[in-house]
C-alpha cells in the first residue's frame, strides 16, 4: 500500500511539474521549453564544458536552427521545481541588450536545464587584467564595456516591472559578445523586489572584494539597489586600473586598490593609481581616466545614500551630467583585507538562474 501511494504521489508530482512548465510556455514572451533530448542532442551529449559552478555545469550547444547557446545543467533541483519555474518566468521576461538572454529551459523528471545566448569572447576578467590577454583592450573599448554594464544595471534597478538586485556584479559575471558589448549574467544570487519597496532584509551574499559595507554588518542591514552600485564601482576601478581590487602578489602598501585610491586622493594624485599609463592608454586619455576614477569613488561611498543611482552614472558617462564633487575618499571598508581567494561566492543562493559562475 505504501509503495502504491508513493508511486501515485510521484505521478501526481510529475504531472503538476509538467503543468506548471506548460503554463510558462503559454505566456507570450517567456522562454522556450525544450525537451531533455533536444538539449542532449544540441550539446552532443553535454560534451563541451564552458564552466562549472556551485549549482551546475555549463555546456556549449547548437540548436537545430544553428543558434549557438550555453546550456546550464543544474545539479540539484529536487523539490524546488515550482520556484525554479517561477524564476524562469520572472527572469526570462526581462529583455535588454546588456543582459545575457535566457532563451529557454527544460523541466523534466525533477531536472532543470537553462539555455542562454552564447557569448564567444567569454567573461570580462579574461580581458582587463595585466598579464592576461586583456591587456590588449584599448581605452575606447573599456569605456564601451563600462557604459554597457551601467545600462544593464539601470534596466534591472529602474526599468523592470520588479526591481532586480543582482548582488554579484564582478568581472566574472560580465560576458562579452563578438563586438565587446558587455552583458550581465548570473542571476544566481539576485532578488526580485516590488517597485514600491525600496529596501529588503537579506543575508550576506556576493563575492568578497565586491560586497558593499552594509552587507557585511552583523546582522546585515536593510539592502537597496545601492549594493550593486558599490560593486559596479569596484569593477570600474578594476577596468580602469587593469588590476584586481586585491592582489596578494603586490607589496602590502599596494595590494588593496581601495586603499591606493584613498592614499592618492589625499595626495591629489589619482592618476598615479594607473601603472604604466603611457603603455596602456594614450596621453590624451588622462583627464577621462581621472573622471572615471571619480565616478568609481562616487559609487563607493560608505554611506549608501551618498551613492548615485545607476541612471545618474549613465548620464555622467554619456557627458550630460557632472560627477558629484563633494566626495569622501575615506573608505572604511578598505581597512578590511579580503580573503586571498576573492572569487569565491558563498554557497547559499536565492536563485538557480546563473551562467556561468
How would you describe each model-predicted region?
Residues 1-115, 120-151, 195-201, 207-208, ...:
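Membrane-proximal cytoplasmic juxtamembrane segment of single-pass receptors
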Residues 164, 183-186:
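Pre-DFG segment of protein kinase catalytic domains
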Residues 228:
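Conserved catalytic-loop aspartate of Hanks-type protein kinases
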Amino acid at each position: 500500500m505504501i509503495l502504491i501511494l508513493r508511486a501515485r504521489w510521484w505521478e501526481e508530482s510529475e504531472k503538476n511539474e509538467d503543468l506548471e512548465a506548460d503554463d510558462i510556455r503559454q505566456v507570450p514572451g517567456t522562454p522556450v521549453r525544450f525537451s531533455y533530448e533536444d538539449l542532449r542532442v544540441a550539446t552532443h551529449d553535454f560534451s563541451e564544458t564552458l564552466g562549472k559552478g556551485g549549482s551546475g555545469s555549463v555546456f556549449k550547444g547548437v540548436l537545430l536552427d544553428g543558434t549557438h547557446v550555453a546550456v546550464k545543467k543544474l545539479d540539484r533541483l529536487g523539490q524546488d521545481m515550482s520556484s525554479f519555474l517561477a524564476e524562469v518566468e520572472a527572469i526570462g521576461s526581462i529583455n535588454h541588450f546588456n543582459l545575457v538572454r535566457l532563451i529557454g529551459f527544460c523541466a523534466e523528471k525533477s531536472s532543470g536545464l537553462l539555455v542562454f545566448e552564447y557569448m564567444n569572447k567569454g567573461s570580462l576578467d579574461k580581458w582587463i587584467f595585466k598579464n592576461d590577454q586583456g591587456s590588449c583592450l584599448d581605452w575606447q573599448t573599456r569605456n564601451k564595456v563600462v557604459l554597457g554594464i551601467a545600462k544593464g544595471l539601470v534596466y534591472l534597478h529602474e526599468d523592470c516591472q520588479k526591481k532586480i538586485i543582482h548582488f554579484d556584479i564582478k568581472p566574472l559575471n560580465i560576458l562579452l559578445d563578438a563586438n565587446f558589448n558587455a552583458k550581465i549574467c548570473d542571476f544566481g544570487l539576485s532578488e526580485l523586489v516590488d517597485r514600491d519597496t525600496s529596501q529588503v532584509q537579506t543575508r550576506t551574499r556576493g563575492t568578497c572584494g565586491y560586497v558593499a559595507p552594509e552587507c557585511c554588518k552583523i546582522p546585515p542591514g536593510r539592502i537597496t539597489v545601492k549594493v550593486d552600485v558599490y560593486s559596479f564601482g569596484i569593477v570600474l576601478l578594476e577596468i580602469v586600473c587593469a588590476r584586481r581590487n586585491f592582489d596578494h602578489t603586490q607589496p602590502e602598501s599596494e595590494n588593496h586598490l581601495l586603499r591606493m585610491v584613498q592614499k592618492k586622493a589625499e595626495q591629489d594624485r589619482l592618476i598615479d593609481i594607473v601603472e604604466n599609463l603611457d603603455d596602456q592608454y594614450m596621453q590624451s586619455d588622462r583627464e577621462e581616466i581621472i573622471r572615471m576614477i571619480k565616478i568609481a569613488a562616487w559609487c563607493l561611498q560608505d554611506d549608501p545614500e551618498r551613492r548615485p543611482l545607476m541612471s545618474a552614472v549613465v548620464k555622467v558617462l554619456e557627458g550630460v551630467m557632472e560627477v558629484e564633487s563633494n566626495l569622501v575618499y575615506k573608505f572604511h571598508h578598505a581597512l578590511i583585507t579580503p580573503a586571498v581567494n576573492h572569487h569565491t561566492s558563498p554557497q547559499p543562493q536565492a536563485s538557480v538562474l546563473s551562467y556561468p559562475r
